[in-house]
Amino acid sequence: MHTLDTVDASSLRTDIPDFRPGDTLKVHVRVVEGNRSRVQVFQGVVIRRQGSGVRETFTVRKVSFGVGVERTFPVHTPVIEKIEVVTRGHVRRAKLYYLRDLRGKAAKIREKRENRETTEA
């Protein structure tokens, strides 16, 4: 079993920022079309993060032209160029599936306020 752990540890990424459900992310995804490769940005709210280690995934939801779009990404996949945290959200749940039923302002997530002591120190 230790050999599996070492293989898993070698394929983990270290450039992933700390993010939680409720945070708004910009996920830069490498898309291959034929022989060309380009980077596509997917910005939305993290509605879940599950698993651990190499198998850890997160789901990002956005509303595009009135249609809700959700994409699930493995955290440690090489397809992701980078992840940017746009805003930190203040939520009380680990899985935000209830956002699927909300529209407009009701689907808005409160922004987390930073403590002054931690930012000044």
From Swiss-Prot:
Belongs to the bacterial ribosomal protein bL19 family. GO terms for cellular component: cytosolic large ribosomal subunit. This is Large ribosomal subunit protein bL19. One of its GO terms (molecular function) is structural constituent of ribosome. Keywords: Ribonucleoprotein, Ribosomal protein. InterPro entries: Ribosomal_bL19 (IPR001857), Ribosomal_bL19_CS (IPR018257), Ribosomal_bL19_sf (IPR038657), Translation_prot_SH3-like_sf (IPR008991). HAMAP family: Ribosomal_bL19 (MF_00402). It comes from the Bacteria. NCBIfam families: rplS_bact. GO terms for biological process: translation. This protein is located at the 30S-50S ribosomal subunit interface and may play a role in the structure and function of the aminoacyl-tRNA binding site.
